[in-house]
Regions:
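Bacterial N-terminal signal peptides that target proteins for export
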Residues: 1-9
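Bacterial N-terminal signal peptides
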Residues: 8-18
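OB-fold and OB-like single-stranded nucleic-acid-recognition modules
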Residues: 21-161
């Protein structure tokens, strides 16, 4: 009986989500998300070549090159990662693009473990993990060497396999 109720509730939820999603247009989505912003764009912003994109969310992809857990307490968890991507310039040079992303809150506590468990779950993020991130650019900051980076507030994160 309980299983049937759960199945019915799950079906109702999925149908409701489908109806809601079909009501959204591409224009509605583009009012919220700016797909033109990439790590390359954010690197140009940090260098002062473009304004900080604000008012919309961005979708970024790249590889985690640094993980710094700032607050280890679950309730007030805060981690800053450096996300990096790059491109070949000709046959000999590679240009890299980076930004910092802060993830805060208890929902990220299990995604960014302080130590890798013996059997990590697929949604866990470690050094060198490829990611897709949805976030909001918030500021320009500098690292210990004085290099400027755009700081993004991370809202959602998913490893790419």
């Amino acid at each position: 009986m309980r299983r049937s109720v759960r199945l019915v509730l799950a079906c109702v939820l999925l149908l409701s989500a489908a109806v809601f999603a079909s009501a959204l247009s591409r224009a509605d989505f583009e009012r919220v998300v700016d797909f033109s912003v990439s790590l390359k764009t954010l690197t140009a912003v940090a260098a002062g070549k473009a304004p900080l994109p604000t008012g919309k969310l961005v979708v970024l992809d790249g590889t985690v090159s640094d993980v710094n857990i700032i607050n280890k307490e679950e309730a007030t968890f805060l981690v800053r990662i450096e996300l990096i991507s790059g491109e070949w310039i000709g046959f000999e040079d590679v240009k890299s693009y980076t930004c910092y992303i802060d993830f805060s809150g208890p929902e990220f506590f299990k995604i960014f473990p302080a130590r890798a468990p013996k059997n990590p779950s697929p949604e866990m993020v470690f050094l060198n993990t490829r990611l897709v991130v949805i976030g909001r650019p918030v500021d320009i900051t500098a690292n210990h060497q004085g290099e400027k980076r755009v700081l993004v507030e991370g809202l959602l994160v998913r490893p790419i396999k």
